[in-house]
Amino acid sequence: MKQRSILWQAAGFALVTFGGTILHFLYDWTGGSILVSPFSGVNESTWEHMKLLFWPLFLFALVQRLFFRDQENYWCVKLAEILLGLVLIPVLFYTYNGVFGKSPDWINIAIFYITALLVFLFKWWMFKKDFLPCKYPRLALAAICLIGVLFVVFTFTPPQIP
């Protein structure tokens, strides 16, 4: 079981980082297609980079769930994993920029990959410890879906933050 879990985490990390990298360029590759804009990065904002992590994590979660049906706390762990990733990207980005003033592109790329690695290590640890009780897995899944809806809505109508 331990080897199976490590293989899942490694495969997930590879697929999520590959998917996020593809999504980073997909909008430009399609000539700014409105069909891919909810899922891909339409500009270089931190928000758009959070989408690049969210969508591959969500798709991988749907596939992985088919193989982890016996994991009762699955969706709660997935929600915690996604929330951690969505918090880490802006925290790491703004911390780096706050300290050094500006971040080169390679730092932004490193932040994405480091965040992906940390969320997969976190998820592996959460499943291994099995201490996150999940009384309402459907609510956790609904929260994940709501995050996806917010990414779509805010892609087309971003909030005006002063």
Predicted regions, residues:
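Terminal transmembrane helical module of multi-pass membrane proteins
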Residues: 127-162
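Short aromatic-rich membrane-water interface segments that cap or initiate transmembrane helices
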Residues: 38-51
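Membrane-interface helix caps and helix-loop-helix hairpins in membrane proteins
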Residues: 71, 95-106
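Small-polar-interrupted transmembrane alpha-helices in polytopic inner-membrane proteins
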Residues: 20, 24, 60-61, 77-94
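Hydrophobic cores of alpha-helical transmembrane segments in multi-pass inner/ER membrane proteins
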Residues: 51-64, 113-124
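Alpha-helical transmembrane segments of multi-pass membrane proteins
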Residues: 15-32, 152-159
